[in-house]
Amino acid sequence: MREILKNVRRLVVKIGSSSLTHPETGKINLAAMERFVRECADLKNAGFEVIIVSSGAIAAGMGRLALPEKPKNLPEKQACAAVGQGVLMHLYEKFFSEYQVIAAQVLLTGEDLAVRKRFLNAKHTFSALLNYGVVPVVNENDTVAVEEIRFGDNDTLSARVAVLVEADLLVLLSDIDGLYTADPRKNSNARFLPEVLEINEEIEQLAGGSGTAVGTGGMETKIEAAKIAVNAGIPMVIARADYGNLRRILRGEEVGTFFYPKKKKQWKKQWLLSGARVQGSIIVDLGAEEALCSGGKSLLPSGVLGVEGEFPTGAIVAVKNLKGRVIAKGLTNYAAQDILKIKGLHSWEIADVLGHKDYDEIIHRDNLVLVD
């Protein structure tokens, strides 16, 4: 199955803080960073399109500010990120320039990928950068993006970027070889998993909190990234950030843990799964669940039991079954308050209740994507 990696031309590579810093001091490891840039530059010069999602801004800020340990409160973390992002980007520009490659800084927040208009604008910007032959270096805008600092969002950010740029592959480089049955640093009996066919409950349970002193993410966020990528039809590999591993992965060698992709979805449905901000939920009955999941139908008011939250027309909503499990996401044709009035009714009754009928469906099937 790894044979598909030989056809990759556009890849997103996320490198973690632990792979760019000295473990003793938390400061930037210049030799490690130079080796990483050299391999990416070599891939670029060989005809690959490379997008980097780089952690390390907070760690770089710690070094510049001479802090002995990672700050614990949010304002100090954001201050470190503000100082460190400039340091980090200066180093990327310096190292890439040695190989005649231009690097560009791209700072994103969750909002940039959650709002469709901003998502499209970011998509066009990346397209222009790649057409210019530039290597985009992406980071969460740590200074303002509270969620990233709290939850280690660069793993899932990289998956969202992979969806955004329609990448052929996502690679997460870390200080660990891939996914194990237990943390190999704590359990000598841990067994390495070279491939994951499906991200089921068992796989999710294997992901423990293994963040490092300078990083914010662990295996749990990497599994979340894998869900986003494979559901969008993008294969993903978790591997150790050793020099040469990217080349080996692209040759189809068994490096790291390979996550098998699912069938590629239309870009709108990829956005709904990966970046769109959910504003509320619609609860459906068994008949509607079957119609959506097995019949590929639109969601009609007759199958709706209720709503959660308040949301306007055109909002992104989750569709939940009777057990509370999210089975789909979609763009709603009606606001929450109107859905409450027409739930359980036939489509021809909508106008009688609301005084107008803009659509027969609550969510049209073209604007709905199933959550696997």
Curated annotation (Swiss-Prot):
GO terms for molecular function: ATP binding; glutamate 5-kinase activity; RNA binding. Substrate binds at residues 55, 142, 154. It is an enzyme of class 2 (transferase). It comes from the Bacteria. Keywords: Amino-acid biosynthesis, ATP-binding, Cytoplasm, Kinase, Nucleotide-binding, Proline biosynthesis, Transferase. SMART domains: PUA. It catalyses: L-glutamate + ATP = L-glutamyl 5-phosphate + ADP. Its EC number is 2.7.2.11. Pathway: Amino-acid biosynthesis; L-proline biosynthesis; L-glutamate 5-semialdehyde from L-glutamate: step 1/2. Residues 279-357 form the PUA domain. One of its GO terms (biological process) is L-proline biosynthetic process. ATP binds at residues 14, 174-175, 216-222. It is found in: Cytoplasm. SUPFAM superfamilies: Carbamate kinase-like, PUA domain-like. One of its GO terms (cellular component) is cytosol. Its main location: cytoplasm. Belongs to the glutamate 5-kinase family. Catalyzes the transfer of a phosphate group to glutamate to form L-glutamate 5-phosphate. This is Glutamate 5-kinase. The gene is proB.
